[in-house]
Swiss-Prot record:
It is found in: Cell inner membrane. It is an enzyme of class 7 (translocase). NCBIfam families: NuoD, PRK06075.1. The keyword Cell inner membrane applies. This is NADH-quinone oxidoreductase subunit D.
């Protein structure tokens, strides 16, 4: 009798559900996955090596391009690592701005994840809803930095500039009449803080809409419940962090366990799952959006009542103001020196980690006293998650592999680096 062999199938890297350039080699017994072998490196851009040839400040934009849907959180870990080595005091207002934008970034990431995950599983509508809200948050990025994605807004010692007093207005065009423009500009009459506050008031209703579409949806539950189950012990052993770890029932969040910036002054809860399956991870992330909204509300209130500096007063790191630079020769020389040679960091090493939307994102820097890092190592949260794909997918059908890749929230920019 003929021997029945397992079938090998290439999944990706052009597959629409592959989340970028994921290539999986699947070993199948019929339609059941026996082994899932992820092949990485198709988006490798040598970020860690490039940082060794750039000044500390010039590497900030590289951080945006690691996990390119959670831009400012990547920058945050990097600048915190530099600040540790320089013993820099960051003004309180800058810390609140950073935390507010970290949480805006978390919502941006989770909206992208929710829309893409639902689309992979077959729910088209949620994708369109999620992108409606992302527009407003992208406008916040644009208001502070001029860019809708790669902001490069954080700086060692603070942030690039204070929050603007006015929001840009939409103008009438061929594709939009005056009535539509007035509707778009309704909540743009005040400052950026007014715009963000208006968003935080509307957002809980939007999250309820997503839950109405998905949470009790029979097909959604059939596709997610009991799929990709990871026990708490295995989640810890495999190095899972973020929603992947909390979905398995372990309450570990750097914002609570190792508070950085002003998280210890804010009131929020950490959602935790019970079953460790795709459905629990979905519920954890949806609740995280609500908690992020709470944090943003508190930051807006504090920032409104406490004006102040947003950059350290250590001028070995902080450039002079534009006004001084254009009226004073010494300040111009100072500015030129900071942006050509850059500041020198004392010999030493530092690791700083943030609670990134995907897990623990860490940057380990080693300095030899020069104006460039001797070595930079990035701890990408998605890397251990992708490593666990083989264990999570074993025994499931091919269709479930798509669900499991979706629940891991994989972005290859940070995995391949």
């Amino acid at each position: 009798m003929a021997e029945i062999k397992n079938y090998t199938l290439n999944f990706g890297p052009q597959h629409p559900a592959a989340h970028g350039v994921l290539r999986l080699v699947l070993e199948l017994d019929g339609e059941v996955i026996q082994r899932a072998d992820p092949h990485i490196g198709l988006l490798h851009r040598a970020t860690e090596k490039l940082a060794e040839q750039k000044t500390y400040l010039q590497s900030v934009p590289y951080m945006d391009r690691l996990d390119y849907v959670s831009m400012m959180c990547n920058e945050h870990a990097y600048v915190m690592s530099i600040e540790k080595m320089l013993n820099l005091e960051v003004p309180l207002r800058a810390q609140y701005i950073r935390v507010m934008f970290d949480e805006i970034t978390r919502i941006l990431n989770h909206l992208m994840w929710l829309g893409a995950h639902a689309l992979d599983v077959g729910a088209m509508g949620v994708f369109l809803y999620a992108f409606r809200e992302r527009e407003d948050l992208m406008d916040c990025y644009e208001a502070v930095s001029g860019a809708r994605m790669h902001a490069a807004y954080y700086r060692p010692g603070g942030v690039y500039r204070d929050l603007p007093d006015a929001m840009p207005q939409h103008k009438a065009s061929i594709i939009r009449n005056a009535k539509a423009i007035n509707k778009l500009n309704e909540n743009r009459q005040g400052s950026l803080l007014d715009f963000i506050e208006d968003f935080t008031n509307r957002f809980p209703t939007y999250v309820d809409e997503y839950e109405t579409l998905l949470t009790d949806n029979r097909i959604w539950k059939q596709r997610l419940v009991g799929v990709g189950v990871v026990s708490p012990e295995r989640a810890m052993a495999m190095g899972f962090t973020g929603p992947m770890l909390r979905g398995s029932g372990i309450e570990w969040d750097l914002r609570k366990k190792q508070p950085y910036e002003v998280y210890d002054l804010l009131d929020f809860d950490i959602p935790v799952g019970t079953n460790g399956d795709c459905y629990d991870r979905y519920l954890v992330r949806v609740e995280e959006m609500r908690q992020s909204n709470r944090i943003i509300k508190q930051c807006v209130e504090w920032l409104r009542n406490n004006p102040g500096s947003v950059m350290t007063d250590n001028h070995k790191v902080a450039p002079p103001s534009r006004v001084d630079m254009k009226s004073n020769m010494e300040d111009l020389i100072h500015h030129f020196k900071l942006f050509t040679e850059g500041f020198h960091v004392p010999v030493g090493e530092a690791y700083a980690a943030v609670e990134h939307p995907k897990g623990e994102f860490g940057v380990y820097l080693i300095s030899d006293g020069a104006n460039k890092p001797y070595r930079m190592k990035i701890r990408a949260p998605g890397f251990p998650h992708l490593q666990g794909l083989d264990e999570m997918a074993k025994g499931h059908m091919i269709a479930d592999a798509v669900t499991i890749i979706g629940t891991q929230d994989i972005v290859f920019g940070e995995i391949d680096r």
